[in-house]
Regions:
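Conserved donor-nucleotide/metal-binding helix-loop-beta segment in metal-dependent transferases, i.e.
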Residues: 82-121
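Short internal beta-strands
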Residues: 15-23, 102-103
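Short, acidic, metal-binding catalytic loop of nucleotide-sugar glycosyltransferases
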Residues: 6-14
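Short aromatic/hydrophobic "clamp" motif used to bind/position activated sugar donors
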Residues: 73
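A glycosyltransferase accessory/donor-loop signature
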Residues: 130-236
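The conserved acidic donor/metal-binding loop of glycosyltransferases
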Residues: 77-81
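Active-site-proximal specificity loops/subdomain of glycosyltransferases
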Residues: 24-70
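N-proximal low-complexity "stem/linker" segments adjacent to membrane-targeting elements
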Residues: 1-2
């Protein structure tokens, strides 16, 4: 509720759609109806995977892609707080441009082609094995890599412009990564985030949110002009 009401209260537009994991009680739904304006609630069991992985936030992502033909859709994680008016986001919506929160300040470099993108060097073997690292190392090998873009974004806060091609771009990327890394790899937690970043990067003229105003919290002070914070991992 903090995530939704802080964002909705500052943006002052839009309607709420909630993906339920199946545990919402009647009382939960009544609270959400009161605070969120009778939101549409999607049962996770009703999402059609159609060859995409189950779990790992894929149902959320697929639900967004299925709705963007007619609406501008924003993914908002529950571990976020909007601290001020999100003007860059409001402008992106008005211009019908997709946007994404960045993975860190070092990624404020613009979209790179999949052949030009240089993934960060892992700090330890665990990072090297992480699905995001493996997928990013494989980017240059996808079909037509030089004609596709990528940015290391964060799926916790991303906007998808109205009128997109639904699941088409995500399907292409998923299938290419499954070919290169295996279908089991694409079921690992984190594969959806890389796919989300790929989809945003290949939408027309995407907006990369300035990290000083829209960031991830790592127990460090944020700028006075910070508008949005994503509290990741142990910092939730």
């Amino acid at each position: 509720l903090v995530a939704v009401k802080s964002f909705w209260g500052h943006l002052r537009k839009g309607r709420i759609v909630i993906l339920s994991d199946g545990t919402l009680t009647t009382e939960d739904r009544a609270v959400l109806a009161w605070h969120c304006g009778n939101p549409e609630i999607i049962d996770i069991a009703d999402v059609d995977h159609n060859g995409f992985p189950a779990g790992g936030a894929w149902e959320r992502f697929l639900s967004i892609l299925d709705r963007r033909a007619d609406d501008y859709v924003i993914q908002l994680d529950s571990d976020t707080v909007t601290l001020g008016r999100p003007d860059v986001v409001a402008d992106a919506i008005a211009a019908n441009r997709s946007f994404t929160l960045l993975g860190g300040p070092e990624w404020d470099i613009g979209v790179r082609t999949c052949t030009d993108y240089v993934p960060p060097s892992p700090d330890n073997p665990g990072e090297a094995r992480h699905i995001q690292s493996r997928m990013e190392r494989a980017l240059a090998q996808i079909e037509g890599a030089g004609h596709h873009g990528y940015i290391r974004g964060c799926a916790g806060f991303a906007g998808f412009a109205r009128g997109g091609n639904g699941r088409e771009t995500a399907r292409f990327f998923h299938d290419e990564m499954a070919r290169l890394l295996g279908h089991q790899a694409m079921a690992e937690w984190g594969s959806e985030q890389v796919t989300s970043s790929f989809v945003v990067a290949n939408d027309p003229d995407p907006v990369l949110l300035p990290y000083s105003q829209y960031g991830n919290y790592w127990a460090e002070p944020w700028d006075a002009d910070c508008r949005f914070m994503h509290f990741v991992g142990a910092h939730r």
